[in-house]
UniProtKB/Swiss-Prot annotation:
Function: Fluoride-specific ion channel. Important for reducing fluoride concentration in the cell, thus reducing its toxicity.
Name of one Pfam family that matches: CRCB
Catalytic activity: fluoride(in) = fluoride(out)
Regulation: Na(+) is not transported, but it plays an essential structural role and its presence is essential for fluoride channel function.
UniProt superkingdom: Bacteria
Membrane topology summary: Multi-pass membrane protein
Span of the signal peptide: none
Entry's Gene Ontology BP terms: cellular detoxification of fluoride
Gene for this chain: fluC
Regions that span the bilayer: 2-22, 36-56, 71-91, 100-120
Keywords: Cell inner membrane, Cell membrane, Ion channel, Ion transport, Membrane, Metal-binding, Sodium, Transmembrane, Transmembrane helix, Transport
Protein's name according to its UniProt entry: Fluoride-specific ion channel FluC
CC terms in the record's Gene Ontology section: plasma membrane
Cell compartments where the protein resides: Cell inner membrane
Amino acid sequence: MGLLLLLVGIGGGFGAMARFALTQATASISKQIPLGILLCNIIGSLIIGMMAAFLIETKLFNEDVSAYVRFLLVTGFLGGFTTFSSFSLDILNLLQRGEIFIAIGYIMVSVLASLIAVILGFYIVMGVYK
């Protein structure tokens, strides 16, 4: 339990730093749409789909190593990189500014693009192993 907790913490720290870097890098691109969080969630969904397929298909790892990889990268890094709470706060901020249609569009694009990304990531990796 202690090692898994450490792996989640390390992965989460790096994921949060990567999210911060991406949101800072994209802040000047759009003042209305929270592009950084949108990209984090879409990229994270793509990667989690790829990781799911990789861990299912590859025989490189035994079950114990797969658990360590999953806790470090999926639960830790991607948990720190993607964020539902920031997404929700961004929506609240848009609504408070009266930008209802932008908020609705942001919700739709975020959910649909993230879902498409996780499916795409999964099947890209599954295709490699078939």
